[in-house]
């Protein structure tokens, strides 16, 4: 009887703990369900966007083409095929590279305090450089670990790299491209 009670309590604890869990590590999930999602593809990348943001997606493709030749300068492994997801229904301006699953997400509302280059081009250069950085983490011990735990190994590799180096390198790249 005591074992059954302990098993029931452990099961209840496990169920209560999962209340806050979700399938993704990070999700901006603010897009209306009425969006019809489209995509534009090239050999190197894919832009996923709602049908209402076709103009933003076209500009993003243009900027990706503009920065592609220089984006992996200084790294052994070049950029890789990765989807770029546009989220236009927001009031923030930011970008995010996620590795689980691999993608680059853009909150496409322009920043109020713009710089010398078009805001979207700056964001594309910055976040695309982060994607190249993550791709270069996947070698040596981390690559071996990826055969055991999958894409999460690159995330573990991020713990070995200082944040100031990652951000500084991305800012330097976007500055060099301005």
Can you describe what each PLM-predicted range is?
Residues 11, 21-22, 177:
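Cleavable N-terminal signal peptides
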Residues 165-167:
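Glycine-rich (often Gly-Gly/Gly-Pro-rich) flexible segments and glycine-rich loop motifs
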Residues 4-14:
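Sec-dependent N-terminal signal peptides
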Residues 6, 22-23:
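Cleavable N-terminal export/targeting peptides
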Residues 172-178:
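Short helix/loop segments within enzyme catalytic domains
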Residues 23-156, 162:
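Juxtacatalytic substrate-recognition/specificity segment
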């Amino acid at each position: 009887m005591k074992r059954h009670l302990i098993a029931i309590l452990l099961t209840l604890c496990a169920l209560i703990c999962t209340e806050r869990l979700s399938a993704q590590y990070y999700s901006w999930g603010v897009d209306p369900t009425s969006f019809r999602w489209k995509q534009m593809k090239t050999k190197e990348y894919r832009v996923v966007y709602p049908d209402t943001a076709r103009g933003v997606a076209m500009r993003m493709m243009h900027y990706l083409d503009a920065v592609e030749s220089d984006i992996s300068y200084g790294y052994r492994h070049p950029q890789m095929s990765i989807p770029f997801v546009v989220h236009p229904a927001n009031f923030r301006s930011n970008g995010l590279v996620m590795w689980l699953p691999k993608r680059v997400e853009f909150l496409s509302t322009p920043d109020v305090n713009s710089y010398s280059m078009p805001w979207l081009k700056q964001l594309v250069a910055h976040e695309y450089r982060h994607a190249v950085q993550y791709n270069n983490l996947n070698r040596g011990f981390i690559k071996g670990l990826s055969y055991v735990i999958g894409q999460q190994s690159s995330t573990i590799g991020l713990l070995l790299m200082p944040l100031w180096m990652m951000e500084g390198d991305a800012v330097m790249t976007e500055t060099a491209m301005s």
